[in-house]
Amino acid sequence: MRRPNCIAEILRQHTQIIEESNNYYYLKMKTKDNKSQGPLRSLLCLPKNVNQKTDSAFCSVDGYNVKNKFLCTRSPNQDSLYQFWSMAYKKNIHIIVMLSPIDNLMRHRYWSLEEDEVFECREFRIRLRSSAQWIQFLKK
């Protein structure tokens, strides 16, 4: 049964993880086998599809009743921006969830800041369809 406060609980736990591992987040977390998982170390709690033939910087996670529903990765930088959008296009991704804090100094912008504004990355044209802001998070 879904609890009505599950989103708040996920956000609380995410904040707690970041606070507890402040300087070591994405750097020191290891798997049970003590092997690094690259930029996805913080997703150890999610069941991954390890047999997939994708780049190691991406991790596919199943949804409730849909296989490979979510594509998880770190925020792209200038060098990995095209690879990020290529993978999103290849996997037919329409929803992107960014767990890192949003501020005006994002490492590298990879989508439009305003609705209906177009962001271009080589042959890809990315349009922000909608945006909404709540107390704990921003939905774009």
Swiss-Prot record:
Gene Ontology terms for molecular function: protein tyrosine phosphatase activity
Q: Which domain of life is it from?
A: Viruses
Q: Which SUPFAM superfamilies match?
A: (Phosphotyrosine protein) phosphatases II
Q: Ranges for the Tyrosine-protein phosphatase domain?
A: 1-140
Matches recorded under InterPro entries: Prot-tyrosine_phosphatase-like, PTP_cat
Which Pfam family, an example, fits this chain? Y_phosphatase
Family from the record: Belongs to the protein-tyrosine phosphatase family.
What protein am I looking at? Truncated tyrosine phosphatase D1
Organism per entry: Microplitis demolitor bracovirus (isolate Webb) (MdBV)
